[in-house]
Amino acid sequence: MKVSFCIPTYNRVKFIEDLLESINNQSSHSLIVEVCISDNASTDGTEESINIWRDRFNFPIFYQRHNENIGPDRNYLSAVNMGTGDYCWIFGSDDILTKNSLALMEDKLAAGSDIYLCDRRELDISMTKISNPHRRWLNGGSRLFSFSNEADLIEYFSKCNSVGGLFSYLSSIIVKRNKWSDVIFDESYIGTAYAHVYILLRIINNMNS
């Protein structure tokens, strides 16, 4: 199975290297990994660093630099559109992947669900755990929800603690690429910074249509 890390970025060259290192250091999995970076016209040397990273890391890195800043929404969509994997893991360029995440997700992805929502650990810029983190996305532990089942759908949204539970936080989201591609995007959501949420909710809506 192939996973595309779809990374929108703007002037975060000092963070991207740590993210790529965290992906490279994953072990005990057999997933095929690619990295797709959509650059919103960064001016901090991101483009110049790409070839260095390509030589250093053990996965292909695909890079697209826009000639001008196209805004966050279009950059999110651009990053996912670059992916060729079975699943796209939409990842913020200032976050990192925790140890054994790919081994854990390989087991979960075998179920073939359309969308996976991961929680997060909150660290400061020195990678120290924040003492008073925000609430978890959902009440309760890990479980599978079937959104084609009305009772499951209601239960899921009743368990949401924050907007992160509504698929807003980039690095938490893994989506089946063909389901994403099937959605016809509504351009009126450009400028909201939640274009990706629209697509994910449309995927859920399509399960019930």
What spans do the regions from the language model cover?
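Nucleotide-sugar donor-binding/catalytic module of glycosyltransferases
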Residues: 1-209
